[in-house]
Design a protein with these regions (language model features):
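Intrinsically disordered, low-complexity terminal and linker regions
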Residues: 1-134
């Protein structure tokens, strides 16, 4: 899958994608992203790993709702793509496209609990009293 620099707001990820040896092509994520610098998830394995390594810490801030403390309300649970869009400025595309990107990037990653990409999640740190005023 071809993912482009315009799919991201994060400058570090944009730099990974847009480095000197990047190819120009059309993005598979957003049909409006034409003639842009892309990386192919099936060919550019080094870039894939760099982007995974950059995104993984943000994903690890979240846990599936059944693993969160009793103080966590299930009503607070969100899909990861919504949580990331609400809490961070990593992506420059809509939730469905974020989901597609995450599923493509992490489809064979054994270091990530796939349930984070599929189930409702909550941020672990939000419910930890030592980090909040709650």
């Amino acid at each position: 899958m071809k993912i482009c620099e315009k799919c991201f707001n994060n400058t570090e990820i944009v730099e990974i994608i847009a480095n000197d040896n990047s190819k120009f092509d059309n993005c598979d994520i957003d049909n409006d992203h034409l003639g842009v610098k892309i990386f192919d998830t099936t060919k550019d394995i080094d870039k894939l790993e760099l982007i995974r390594d950059y995104l993984r810490p943000a994903l690890e801030l979240y846990d599936i709702s059944i693993n969160l403390p009793d103080t966590f309300s299930l009503k607070e649970g969100k899909k990861i793509e919504i949580a990331l869009k609400d809490d961070w400025s990593i992506f420059n595309v809509e939730e469905a496209q974020i989901s597609c990107i995450l599923n493509e990037l992490f489809k064979d990653d054994e270091n990530l609990d796939r349930r984070v990409l599929e189930d409702l999640v909550g941020a672990k740190i939000i419910n930890d009293k030592k980090y909040t005023n709650k």
